[in-house]
UniProtKB/Swiss-Prot annotation:
Its cofactor is Zn(2+). Residues 18-183 form a propeptide. Keywords: Cleavage on pair of basic residues, Disulfide bond, Hydrolase, Metal-binding, Metalloprotease, Protease, Secreted, Signal, Virulence, Zinc, Zymogen. The keyword Zinc applies. InterPro entries: Fungal_M35_metalloproteases, MetalloPept_cat_dom_sf, Peptidase_M35. This is Probable neutral protease 2 homolog TRV_06370. Its EC number is 3.4.24.39. It is an enzyme of class 3 (hydrolase). Binds 1 zinc ion per subunit. GO terms for cellular component: extracellular region. GO terms for biological process: proteolysis.
Length: 356
């Protein structure tokens, strides 16, 4: 993936695949236009439509440098399989390189190959679009103070399947191998020093928090409305069921349907990434920064090992179907999601569990 700056800056938004009602002070301040530049190549042009400089966070956005979910791809009305990564980023101690200052009426371009993160081997017509929420900071600052929204044009492309299949997959093709602890599906050969013990503790805490969250979902309608924007019986049942599924997957006595690695062997642990999931493979990988988090964080909505593990497990279709996306990070962004998006947002589950 490559960036071509129209300005001397790069940056971006947060969370793909969310169409979110905007508050008056959070109306759309950027325009995103998609264009096809090759068989499976996309150029996204991002323009600041406002009259003030925007400082945009790049994490999990259409301008993320990493093989994350930048667009939604459909064929014959069905979603094309995503083969890239769904990371959880560290949201504290953000540094300037994670942002872009985009001046009034200025634009940047970002190009990427859909075939590197989607299975386009079938070929034929596809429909591509992007929409989401972008965390923002004040100019030359790194503290998130708000967000803006975007929705791109809808782009139709005719893809040559053989040519697309020849594109190297960003996260590798063959499955990783190693010695697996069948009790939890942890690849023990990927662990060094105390990492196995740390991960086992995180899974145990994830199971405990998930069970408590399932109970809270059923007994605390005010908290359901706070995080999931509704307390109707269908949503309560779905949320509780998903938490119980995460609890089962987290339990050391489970055979497990995901494969969990103590360390990265696919090159996904970029700066700022705590852990990431490959939903196409039901695999989770911890990054070095994961081990710098506390096991549990007593600060409400603070990131820790337990809720990071919980967050990543919701990204796995073997645990939650359809698997959760990264539609909004942090309490303020989660609070801005409507009910239809909150229930599909991974951080909504981790924050709810942390807040109980």
């Amino acid at each position: 993936m490559q960036f071509t700056a129209l300005l001397a800056a790069l940056g971006a938004p947060l969370a793909l695949a969310a169409s979110i009602p905007a508050a008056a002070h959070n109306h759309s301040m950027i325009d995103v236009q998609l264009a096809a530049t090759g068989n499976s190549m996309i150029k996204a042009t991002i323009t600041n439509t406002g009259d003030r400089t925007l400082n945009l966070l790049k994490f999990n956005t259409i301008m993320d440098e990493h093989p994350t979910r930048k667009v939604m791809v459909y064929q014959d009305g069905a979603e094309v399989q995503f083969t890239g990564m769904l990371p959880r980023y560290k949201m504290s101690d953000l540094t300037p390189e994670y942002f872009v200052n985009l001046g009034p009426k200025a634009s940047v371009e970002h190009s990427f190959d859909l075939a590197a993160t989607h299975d386009l081997s079938r070929g034929g017509k596809i429909v591509v679009k992007a929409h989401g929420m972008v965390p923002t900071a004040e100019e030359n600052a790194t503290t998130i103070t708000g967000h803006t929204l975007y929705e791109s044009n809808e782009l139709t492309m005719d893809v040559d399947g053989k040519q697309a299949a020849a594109v190297e997959q960003a996260m590798g093709g063959d499955d990783s191998t190693g010695v697996i602890d069948k009790r939890s599906n942890i690849v023990t050969s990927s662990c060094r020093g105390s990492q196995l013990r740390v991960l086992q503790t995180a899974l145990s805490n994830s199971a405990r928090l998930s069970r408590a969250a399932a109970s809270a979902a059923q007994r605390n309608p005010s908290k359901m409305r706070e995080y999931f924007k509704t307390a109707d019986s269908r949503t309560v049942q779905k949320v509780a069921s998903r938490f119980l599924s995460v609890a089962r997957e987290s339990s050391s006595g489970s055979t497990g349907r995901t494969t969990y690695y103590c360390n990265d062997n696919r090159g996904g642990c970029h700066p700022g990434v705590l852990a990431y999931t490959l939903p196409s493979k039901n695999q989770v990988f911890n990054c070095p920064s994961y081990y710098q988090l506390p096991a549990l964080n007593n600060r409400c909505h603070g990131q820790d090992q337990a809720t990071t593990t919980l967050h990543e497990l919701t990204h796995n279709p073997a645990v939650v179907t359809p698997f959760c996306e990264d539609l909004g990070y942090g309490y303020q962004r989660v609070s801005a999601l409507p009910a239809s998006k909150a229930i599909q947002n991974a951080d909504t589950y981790s924050l709810f569990a942390n807040g109980m």
